[in-house]
Amino acid sequence: MKNLQCSYCGKKEPLVKRIFGGSHQAFICNECIVEFFNLLEREEENRKQKDVRSHLPKPQEIAQFLDQYVISQEKAKMALSVALYNHYKRISYPKHHHIELEKSNILLLGPSGSGKTLLAKTLARVLNIPFAMSDATALTEAGYVGEDVESILSRLLHAASFDIEKAQKGIVYIDEIDKIAKKGESVQSGRDIGGEGVQQGLLKILEGASVYVPLKGARKNSNTETVLFDTKDVLFICGGAFVGIKEERGEKRSGFLASNPSSPTQRTLRKQLLSYGMIPEFIGRIPLILELEPLNLESLVKILKEPKDSIIAQYQYLFSLDGVKLEFTDEALLAIAQKSLDEELGARGLRHILEEILMPLLFEIPSKEEVTQVSITQGFVLGNSEALILEPRREDG
């Protein structure tokens, strides 16, 4: 057949590489096939974006979800809810003319046990998106023994079951970020491979870049299988205690400080972070800085019993699997919270304390089939008395 003509664009051979024939004398060229394929891809992408938008919870709904699992830190929860909503709204809506919304990575400042990790994990649960956590203390500059920054993305890819599209819209939490502050000039230990070098290495992925990521989490080398990973839509949340940064601003904390980045409060905090050892380029890539307050006694008691998956509920479920009802008196809960407060362990210390006091019972009770109920009292928590163990009444005769 000669002089075939595309039924769609009108081009003839040899202006196009190839023309394919179909039934009813319809013909299509290779260029139109590519164009139609791209059109279908765009329509599918638009459909996915509309689907995301229709299921994207509003900030108040996100905050309500956080309230089910996270006690206290109300202002931080509000700011995080807005940040999460805006981040995924930015992803799901097409660009408007020349306006491109930049992503707002987040820095959480707060003492150990104040809820930084829990907040990050729970945010990912709101949208059921991949979540990966990394410890900054394990990171080293590329070329040195340890984990490089690409290993963070490997974890996210693994959390997404190696679905690259899902992984590229996930959340990464980097804990102990204060531990990669650069060392002082007086330190004569050679190159700062775990401090400023790591901060420099994180800059690219924080801002948004395409990097080759090892599939198995190892460092890249010539024999490592890699995949190209675009981080422009990954939300990065960094957390650190930043021990030693004192309140020098002379005003009450607002809980979230990024609403006005040029405010005296915000400027002072950023200066403190720079003095601490965070480099300007790193701080510049994290627009949203949130301060979490230390948890007080009342908050710790609430954490024990009020969240949807509270620590007390978890232990009660463990005991129920052996047919035993576990109860705590109000005084016992208060004593547990006070212990954690005295030891400055925060919410993280509650599980440690509970595990310690319940260990003898967890060891003995499964072998005592006659036990039906265990009551934990203040005296038992403080080590002054035994737990109240109830057994069914035996009938005489």
Curated annotation (Swiss-Prot):
Molecular function terms from GO: ATP binding; ATP hydrolysis activity; ATP-dependent protein folding chaperone; protein dimerization activity; unfolded protein binding; zinc ion binding
Gene3D superfamilies the record matches: 1.10.8.60, ClpX chaperone, C4-type zinc finger domain, P-loop containing nucleotide triphosphate hydrolases
Binding residues for Zn(2+): C6, C9, C29, C32
Ranges of residues in domain ClpX-type ZB: 1-48
Positions contributing to ATP binding: P111, S112, G113, S114, G115, K116, T117, L118
Keyword Transmembrane: no
GO biological process: proteolysis involved in protein catabolic process
Annotated SMART domains: AAA, ClpB_D2-small, zf-C4_ClpX
Stored Pfam families: AAA_2 (PF07724), ClpB_D2-small (PF10431), zf-C4_ClpX (PF06689)
Keywords on record: ATP-binding, Chaperone, Metal-binding, Nucleotide-binding, Zinc
Record field: transmembrane: none
Keyword presence, Signal: no
Entry similarity comment: Belongs to the ClpX chaperone family.
Subunit comment: Component of the ClpX-ClpP complex. Forms a hexameric ring that, in the presence of ATP, binds to fourteen ClpP subunits assembled into a disk-like structure with a central cavity, resembling the structure of eukaryotic proteasomes.
UniProt function note: ATP-dependent specificity component of the Clp protease. It directs the protease to specific substrates. Can perform chaperone functions in the absence of ClpP.
Protein name: ATP-dependent Clp protease ATP-binding subunit ClpX 2
Organism of this sequence: Wolinella succinogenes (strain ATCC 29543 / DSM 1740 / CCUG 13145 / JCM 31913 / LMG 7466 / NCTC 11488 / FDC 602W) (Vibrio succinogenes)
Gene: clpX2
